A protein has these predicted regions:
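Conserved acetyl-CoA-binding loop-helix of GNAT-fold acetyltransferases
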Residues: 29-42, 61-65, 69
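Ligand-binding pocket scaffold of soluble enzyme catalytic domains
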Residues: 8-11, 52, 63-74
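Catalytic-site neighborhood detector that most strongly recognizes the C-terminal catalytic loop/helix
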Residues: 88, 93-102
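Acidic/histidine-enriched, glycine/proline-rich intrinsically disordered or flexible terminal extensions
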Residues: 102-144
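A conserved beta-strand-loop-helix scaffold within acyl/acetyltransferase catalytic domains
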Residues: 1-15, 21-25
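Conserved GNAT acetyl-CoA-binding A-motif
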Residues: 45-56
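Conserved beta-strand segments that form the floor/walls of ligand-binding pockets within enzyme
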Residues: 17, 22, 53-55, 93
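Conserved catalytic-core motifs of GNAT/GCN5-like acyltransferases
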Residues: 73-87
Length: 144
């Protein structure tokens, strides 16, 4: 079905990177896959970490979209960060920090409620619809 891992755990600075995410179509943009990401973020914050990071190949549009769907803020691209299969790889960075968690948690809880799914696997309100206003505020420095 799928796998996701914590990578680059930095206890000193309080950051954890999530990565090596490989979901089959059975989990992609589905309630169960989203809940797994929610639980990983929740664990990280509840255990005193301050920063939840997501990095991906800048050409991987599905991964970039997934990060933003989950409410992670786009932080930029590290150009020529590595060489992959003989080519330069640019790495896109996304993150959520502890101060944002209460807002993101509300989005996840609302999204994951049974009432949001009714009798269908498809949500009534998508997670993107819920996190989009949060990302807008983050990108416009409206959170202190």
């Amino acid at each position: 079905m799928g796998v996701a891992s914590f990578l680059r755990i930095n206890q000193t600075d309080g950051s954890i990177e999530v990565g090596h995410i490989n979901y089959s179509p059975l989990l992609q943009r589905k309630r169960e896959g989203t809940e797994a990401m929610y639980l990983m973020m929740k664990w990280e914050i509840e255990n005193g970490y301050r920063r939840y990071e997501w990095k991906c190949n800048a050409l991987n549009k599905k991964s970039r979209y997934a990060a933003q769907r989950l409410g992670l803020s786009y932080e930029g691209v590290f150009r020529q960060m590595s060489i992959n299969k003989g080519r330069n790889r640019n790495t896109a960075w996304f993150a959520a920090i502890d101060k944002e968690w209460k807002f993101l948690k509300e989005c996840f809880v609302k999204y994951l409620k049974d009432e949001n799914f009714g009798t269908s696997e498809k949500p009534i309100i998508s997670l993107s619809e819920l996190t989009k206003p949060i990302l807008y505020k983050l990108d416009n420095d409206e959170f202190v």
